[in-house]
Amino acid sequence: MKRRRLIAALAVSALALPALAEWQPSKPVRIVVPFAPGGQPDLVARTLAEPLARALGQPVLVENRPGAGGNVAAEAVAKGAPDGHTLLVATNGPFAVSPALSRSLPYDVERDFAFVTMVGSSPSLVAVHPSLGAATLSEVVAIAKARPGELNYASVGKGSVSQLSMALLSAETGIETVHVPYSGGVQAVAALLAGDVQLLSLVPTALIPHVAAGRIRIVAQTGATRSPLVPDVPTVAESGFPGFAAPVWMALVVPAKTPPEAVKRLHAELARIIRAPEMKERLWDRQWIDPIGSTPEEAARVVREETAKWARIGRTLGIALE
């Protein structure tokens, strides 16, 4: 009888272990953003920080570490303490474009990071300065071909998707343009508004507010289908360049050796937050991010597929990053 009671007690204790062993942060958690303040990744991180802090019972701080198209922040987080207290906003540039097209990187996406969740995706828009005199992508191409090497395009940094989508567009349309990198979306948009550059491909958050004022024009969107945000603007493919698609996505990752229980807790809380109806309003209605809140495995799969896609593009068009 005593033996049966002991076995039953052990069974009950075993069932209670997962709840007792749930990971809990012991200090403030950081979300590192690989770009300057004010851009879409920064806004997304700050949107998630408050509800995540409530869920974890610890402050969640947002730290901006711009540089090298996001690679500076990626390297820093890869080499940081794998204790669950540091997350990185992972975007196309440092997590798919750079690994596919760079000859060498100070980090390896598959070796150095563990995925937590795919936050969401967003279309990119191709914007022009009104002084260019173009209202459609076809007109931009015609002007660029008449003035080879004279048109400049801004980006949020070398190796960013804002650079590579324009490089890809230039290659596929047969135009010659000059890349001018900036440290973030705010700086790139400021350059376009000032007329320092004529072209910019970036997420709607940064561009839409300036359209109504007539300070910029949107000539195309880079997604495979039209976004309901700008239903009257054709995709690049619809503008006469079939097969073109370069959407923007954002994931959250941690250093590779982060304890599985920490990854599990972070994923559970973040997926719940991202999928909540009120977060859909904050992400989509205000920032034009289509929220996902995927599993870690699904996020890793998307990044692998994106990396393979950019590698194919690089080989086909001869695009490489120094």
Regions found by a protein language model. Name each.
Residues 21-111, 150, 158, 174-199, ...:
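N-terminal (or domain-start) structured segment
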